[in-house]
From Swiss-Prot:
Catalytic reaction list: uridine(2457) in 23S rRNA = pseudouridine(2457) in 23S rRNA
Enzyme Commission number(s): 5.4.99.20
Full protein name: Ribosomal large subunit pseudouridine synthase E
NCBIfam families listed in its UniProt record: pseudouridine synthase
Coiled coil regions in record: none
Function: Responsible for synthesis of pseudouridine from uracil-2457 in 23S ribosomal RNA.
Family to which the UniProt record says this protein belongs: Belongs to the pseudouridine synthase RsuA family.
Gene behind the chain: rluE
Superkingdom of the organism of origin: Bacteria
Amino acid sequence: MSFRSSSTSPRSNKQTATKRFKQSGQAQSVGSPKRHSVKRKNNEQSKKSLSLAERKIIIFNKPYDTLSQFTDGEGRKTLADFIPVKEVYAAGRLDRDSEGLMVLTNDGILQAKLTQPKSKSPKTYWVQVEGAPTEAQLEPLRRGVELKDGLTLPAQVEIIQDPQLWERNPPVRFRAAIPTTWLAITIIEGRNRQVRRMTAHIGFPTLRLVRYSMGGMTLQDLQPGEWKEISLPS
């Protein structure tokens, strides 16, 4: 990817390559059994009848301060401000104050594969934290940390060089006397604000969070607000 630099990580002596992070339970509705059965049958039929020609997969670089949904009653930026394609839905969410890769599709099977916990689909985030954690301080994340909603599964965590990202608008607020560090964190869960809570748990608050990859798909060279339609093998 070709990006403009916004800040420099003090851990530039770490030579870990970010390339290694290119990753090559259904809810039951409440109601009458008959209606549930018909709905389930229709959903299964629509999935089976979706051909490769009909399948749409879109990758999108979500800008900061954008909601990961198509509608909003409060006038905030949404996916509809950037993506004109109809009948595609986000596979998972990305916080309003986070940036990076979102996958949108009309393929229910792919959507489930990317989002359901049992699929254990990897998601990699580039995370700028306040401070300079040591390998020993990062080790709890690799083992799992106890958050309010339970113990996290082990994560892959590495210190990386500044990934040379685009400038964020608004800029990240830094404290001049405190260094920052970039981490690549890969998880196979999708709890609310999980990565931010994980880094805060070990004493290094997240300043900036960018999702780089999801289920083997990456940001490629997309700039904030850009999207493209891609195809995947059947």
